[in-house]
Amino acid sequence: MASTMMNYQDCGPMRYKSSVPVPASLYENTAYPSKFRPRISKHVDVADKACWEACDDFENATGLKLKADSVGCINPIGGNVNALWFPEAIPERLHIISYLSELLFRHDDLTDDAVTPEQFDEVHGPLARFLGSESKQSDHTTKHNAMNTMQARVAIEALEQNEQLGKLVIEKWKGIVSVRGQDAFMEHKTLDSYMHVRHYDAGAYSVWSQILFCCDISLTDEELTGLEPLTWLAFTQMILWHDYCSWDKEAATYLEREEGGSNMSAVQVYMAMYGLDQYAAKEFLLSEITRIEDEYCERKASYMIEFPPAPHITHYIGLIEMCMAGNTLWHLSSRRYNPAAPLPRREDIGKVNGGPLDASEVSKPVECSESDLGILTPVSSRLSTKRLRPFWNNQRTEYTTMTPAETSSDDKKKKAKASHETREDLLTVSPCAWPAEPDEKDILAAYLYTAARPASGARDKLMDALDKWYRVPPDALATIRTIIRIMHNASLMLDDVQDNSPVRRGSPSAHVIFGTAQTTNSASYLMIKCVDLARRLGDDSLSCLLSELSQLHLGQSHDLAWTFHCKAPSIPEYYSHLEQKTGGLFRMASRMMRASATQNKHLDACKLMSLLGRLYQLRDDYQDITSESLSTYDDLDEGSFTLPLIHALHREEEQGEVQLHSILQSARAARSASASSNNDGKLSVETKLLIREMLEEAGSLEHTRVVIRGLYDETRAVLTAMENEAGSGGKNWMLHLITFQLKV
């Protein structure tokens, strides 16, 4: 254990702007094992207020009352963990990150009762899918949507502060909530395998992104990679110290469960590796924590001599060390892990060491008083005498090298397929499910194949967001979700047939596998079933579906005619087409939800849905032609007219030229010939490059960017107006995030 005469060192070297020293009495004692002096933000009150705000939002949104002894980030002794992790943070960004951290603690509490990988995923999965991939029907509960609303709020506020660093925070945050149950419940035979998962699960990769964001620092990928030998050690020390301090609480929780459960801790890894009891394992872990910090200091000294870093890198290293020191102090005195510590109270906002933060406190050795010993004593002295049983069983899997951030595309496809394997997964909607026909197998085959392909889940996320306003009864909303999902996939099947598209979502299109006739028949059958489902919801829902279904077909008719005749529409005609086709499904969802709404029934989202549909498609147009991969230029291969292409063709016509039009006519002839040959009808790389060059010269790409930015502003204005119309509580963070993600 550390000596009271330890030679403490300041973090850095660096200049301090927003932090002050922590009172020395909190760390100059035998309980604090680190060499680094902790500092705390002068704006600790900002962090505390953000955390209380997150608690209130959680209770109001979920209807769940937090337990009286439930503790997150706030600590009236050592200070708020975010003020200790990020003492040099910009106040506005400290507020954002503190809210996010409190959300993580509340989410972590929800996973505490999980005793199987499946139960873990039930709680953990929806947050990850909201930030990334296609959702599941079980994701859309009030509790999950409440957590997603809080995530969306943090994401929007971070992106508005700094889009680049905000995106980095969101990306790394997704890594935390993407850890799967099989990873959380696996047996680890070595500390390396354990740490490999914990660097995701415990948020190590998220912490460094938050440091950059909070302190407004930009490092290149090369600079971050060069620092990995240091950052890996620093974050390993933080994770192991967490395991050391949290062991009593987590072990006690585990022992209370008759059925066992997850108890991911380095203490238990050491117990299994070396056959130690919990006391010896904890002492061994503490020695490892000290050794790792020593190794960090040695490596840092060598790094500073061999590769003298630029000032901004030196500053970043200092921020990491402050994070290490703050993490060490906070765990010692937090009620979350120490039952002798006081509970946070709202009247204690901004307090440190039980009183207001004193910026004049100097680092002077002070011995602990007897009253402090219940809080600042080595955790090993508070261990219970109860022994533990192993936490794994034969059903748990061993560690694999696949990590959440490194999941292969094949693995993603398998997971997507696994969630859409059966008729029941895709079609059954209680209580409005239609009876299974005795001979449905053939007619559903093409549809089930299409629905099993990975998708973005954009429409499900949109309905989650709209339900913030409409509060549709769960059964009705589940039916509407199924209708929209089926209508979307069925329309894609028909589009691929009519456009002769060989690929959909990275796999062969359904008609390539099942033939045109079977695919068309399957899609038509499913659309009929959707009409039946809408009828069961009521006349208003049926009317919504039929009117928007008509618009979808009208929009497709224009697209087919333009492509067949190789005649570009006017830009207003193209916009009208987008509102019919892409906006049609969005409006169908919003109108059906409004028809079944229990609140805000007066709120008409049609204009917003039309704008979102247009924005969604124009961004897709732009990204397809500006992609670095030539193989992505699908619109050119299919002969589809997009805004950049339409703009360039009209400019060419004004100038009396025909080159671009001639290329498109030749491409159309090649596609027609490919229908009776082995040629896939795709444009050559050289032709695609030429078209891209012509679009740039015509100013069509810049024109598209300008249009998208203007449309983005218009969409946000309409969204704000709807929020005002919805009245108190009408702020829709999820819709703001959906809109922001369409920005270019």
From Swiss-Prot:
Dimethylallyl diphosphate binds at R504, K581, T582, Q617. A motif (DDXXD) lies at residues 108-112, 495-499. Mg(2+) 1 binds at D108, D112. GO terms for biological process: alcohol biosynthetic process; isoprenoid biosynthetic process; mycotoxin biosynthetic process. One of its GO terms (molecular function) is geranylgeranyl diphosphate synthase activity. Residues 1-344 are annotated as: Terpene cyclase. Its EC number is 4.2.3.214, 4.2.3.215, 2.5.1.29. Isopentenyl diphosphate binds at R459, H488, R505. The keyword Cell membrane does not apply. It holds the Pfam family Terpene_syn_C_2. The keyword Hydrolase does not apply. Residues 409-422 have a biased composition (Basic and acidic residues). It catalyses: isopentenyl diphosphate + (2E,6E)-farnesyl diphosphate = (2E,6E,10E)-geranylgeranyl diphosphate + diphosphate; (2E,6E,10E)-geranylgeranyl diphosphate = (5R,12R,14S)-dolasta-1(15),8-diene + diphosphate; (2E,6E,10E)-geranylgeranyl diphosphate = delta-araneosene + diphosphate. This is Dolasta-1(15),8-diene synthase. It comes from Colletotrichum gloeosporioides.
